[in-house]
Design a protein with these regions (language model features):
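Periplasmic/extracellular loop-to-transmembrane helix junction in inner-membrane transport proteins
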Residues: 17-53, 68-69, 74, 118-126, ...
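Transmembrane-helix boundary motif in ABC transporter permease subunits
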Residues: 16, 50-82, 94, 98, ...
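N-terminal signal-anchor/first transmembrane alpha helix
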Residues: 1-16, 75-81, 237-244, 267-297, ...
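Membrane-interfacial helix termini and adjacent extracytoplasmic/periplasmic loops
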Residues: 26-27, 35-38, 73-76, 93-136, ...
Length: 531
């Protein structure tokens, strides 16, 4: 029952959005089609194409270089290439605006050095669709890098040896052998990056790029058009569910069998001279542009800022962020335990369906989840308030939608898949014989969970708590839409200050978010270094 309750909670936003869109009437969707729908669709589609190509090129190229070749500092780059994953794309957007915008250090230096006026030269506009795509590529390519690297490591060395023996040069062998074998894993990584792209709100909103994500927020808040927001959410939901199906299909194909045991593996290709330094540049560029330069820019802005991170106001933002993140992380992991244990104890179609439904939330953008939860619970609040007024002459107000608990539910729906993945990864260590031994001693399912599973799963569960905690700290669209009045977090404060062009003030909360985001990246780096 608990497992299905969790699954139904994940399904509720999608059903509510669909119902609200269908009951919104045709006038709203006709108006959207005549005005902004085409622009939203075109910008979202173009962003998907650019991010897909960018993450593929950077992620696959870097993975092949560090796996199949040897050059100076290759071990360092194996780990360093993961670090940009700690940066939310909207934080990178703030940093690069301070560097590349008209008053930024790059253009200011150009004008001072060359004696140019503002109209004497052309400079690429960072606040554009191309700029937004670049920010997303820099923080999302590690998805492709990690999966492609794992695939290259798992491939049989004999296939590469055979290709080389038949006269193929290393580059040709990569294109004809390594790349096709890694295609399912690479496709899964690109699709994960695309899911994050369509869910992004902070970057595209700050750069003024109109997508479905920004359209939902504008319709809900600026125009008060709930039906329009729901219909836009359905469009975005269709994108997301299609990607979820594709990602699941690709992940299902990404299975490899090592037939090379006992065979000779092709030694890594040693690069020398110009080739070696080109490899260093190609692997170093994503790290420099995705982590080092933004971090230096944020630290410089923070140093110039008059904001005091230890003031009562900022401590309140920190407290709000920590309360939301820790509460959501614990409850999400508890829900993952309930669902994962149900799937183990009751294998079958019912448990498999519950698990599939629960995982859909990761593919659904935060803005869609927010609208999908606010619509039914706002109706419930209004109905309850009307009944209490009529019966007891007492107003209950926004009992549910005005609390942090509905926001926590949104986080649970959004990040349950991540917690389930960590839980199931640890569950492979719990052998079926342990369950049988527990039953033979007269222990029931709950006792087996408490005394057998949980002690073994503790490291995986702590990892799940950490992953969800950090994801909640970085989540922006759901928090912006659903937070109670005057209940701001670090992400909201950073977005608000950056939107007001107060980048120095936005730097401090952004640095805290990045520092917290480094925690799971450190765990990933340890795994990369170990394997």
């Amino acid at each position: 029952m608990v497992a299905w309750a969790v699954a139904l909670l994940c399904l509720l936003p999608m059903l509510a959005v669909l119902l609200a869109a269908l009951t919104g009437g045709t006038d709203t969707i006709a108006h959207l089609i005549d005005t902004v729908l085409g622009r939203y669709a075109a910008n979202t589609a173009l962003l998907i194409v650019l991010v897909s190509l960018g993450t593929f090129a950077v992620g696959v190229g870097a993975a092949w270089l560090v796996t199949m070749t040897r050059f100076p500092a290759v071990r360092f780059f194996e780990i360093a290439l993961v670090v940009p994953l700690a940066f939310p794309a909207y934080v990178l957007a703030y940093a690069y605006t301070s560097i590349l915008d008209h008053p930024g250090i790059v253009q200011s230096t150009l004008r001072a050095t060359m004696g140019w006026g503002p109209r004497d030269y052309w400079f690429p506009e960072i606040r554009s669709l191309g700029g937004a795509a670049l920010m997303l590529v820099l923080v999302l390519y590690p998805y492709v890098y990690l999966l492609a690297r794992a695939s290259f490591l798992q491939q049989s060395g004999s296939t590469f040896v055979a290709a080389r023996a038949l006269g193929s040069r290393p580059w040709a062998a990569f294109l004809k052998v390594s790349l096709p074998l890694a295609r399912p894993a690479i496709a899964a990584g690109v699709l994960l990056a695309v899911m994050e792209t369509i869910a992004d709100f902070g970057t595209v909103s700050y750069f003024g790029v109109q997508t479905f994500a920004t359209g939902i927020y504008t319709s809900w808040f600026s125009m008060g058009d709930r039906a329009g927001a729901a219909q836009l959410a359905v469009c975005l939901l269709s994108f997301a569910l299609l990607l979820a199906v594709l990602e699941r299909a690709q992940r299902g194909q990404a299975k490899y069998h090592d037939t090379s045991r006992g065979q000779k593996h092709e030694p890594p290709l040693k690069l020398e001279g110009v080739q070696a330094w080109m490899a260093v540049i190609l692997c170093g560029a994503p790290v420099l542009f995705g982590a080092v330069f933004p971090l230096v820019a944020l630290m410089s802005l923070g140093w110039e800022s008059e904001q005091n991170l230890l003031s009562d106001r900022y401590l309140r933002f920190v407290r709000n962020s920590l309360v939301l993140a820790s509460t959501a992380a614990v409850l999400t992991v508890v829900a993952a335990i309930a669902l994962g244990f149900y799937q183990r104890m009751r294998p079958g179609r019912s448990s498999a369906l519950a698990g599939y439904v629960a995982r859909l939330g990761y593919a659904v953008p935060g803005g869609v989840i927010a609208v999908g939860l606010l619509v039914p619970f706002a109706a419930f609040d209004n109905a309850l308030d009307a009944w209490m007024r009529a019966t007891f002459d007492v107003s209950t107000g926004l009992l549910v939608t005005g609390s942090i608990w509905l926001l926590v539910c949104a986080y649970m729906v959004r990040f349950l898949a991540a917690a389930l993945g960590a839980y199931e990864g640890g569950q492979s260590l719990v052998h079926a014989n342990m369950d049988a031994a527990s039953r033979s001693l007269g222990k029931g399912p709950l006792a087996t969970l408490r005394w057998v599973h949980l002690p073994i799963l503790t490291p995986s569960l702590l990892t799940a708590v950490l992953i969800v905690f950090v994801d909640v700290m970085k989540e922006l669209p759901a928090t912006l839409i659903m937070r109670p009045f005057n209940y701001d977090t670090l992400a909201v404060q950073a977005f608000r200050l950056a939107s007001d062009e107060r980048l120095e003030g936005a730097a401090l909360p952004s640095l805290v978010i990045v520092a917290v985001g480094l925690l799971p990246v450190i765990l990933i780096c340890r795994q990369v270094g170990r394997h």
